[in-house]
């Protein structure tokens, strides 16, 4: 009986870490993508993350290279520049 209490005391004192089943994923592209070694079937690789893995974005994501919100109003007047 003393051995059991001693074993429990040692077990609780060491605090064995519990490993969860889900890993922490790095986010990229303003939290729109996930850094992975290989992208899933419905994702497209775009650039690379800090850990040299591909930044995987959903195939429907739009990428703005200008860094600001783009104007998506595509009326006929805004498609072509005005002539002087």
UniProtKB/Swiss-Prot annotation:
One of its GO terms (biological process) is defense response to Gram-negative bacterium. Its main location: secreted. GO terms for molecular function: lipopolysaccharide binding. It is found in: Secreted. Keywords: Antibiotic, Antimicrobial, Defensin, Disulfide bond, Secreted, Signal. Disulfide bonds join 28-55, 35-49, 39-56. GO terms for cellular component: extracellular region. Transmembrane segments: none annotated. It holds the Pfam family Defensin_big. Residues 1-21 form the signal peptide. Belongs to the beta-defensin family. Has antibacterial activity. This is Beta-defensin 119. It comes from Macaca fascicularis (Crab-eating macaque).
């Amino acid at each position: 009986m003393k051995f059991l209490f001693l074993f429990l005391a040692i077990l609780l004192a060491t605090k064995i870490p519990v490993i969860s089943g889900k890993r922490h994923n790095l986010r990229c592209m303003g939290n729109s993508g996930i850094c992975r070694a290989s992208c899933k079937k419905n994702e497209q690789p775009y650039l690379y993350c800090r850990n040299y893995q591909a930044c995987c974005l959903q195939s429907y994501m739009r990428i703005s290279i200008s860094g600001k919100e783009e104007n998506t109003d595509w009326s006929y007047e805004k498609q072509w520049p005005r002539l002087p």
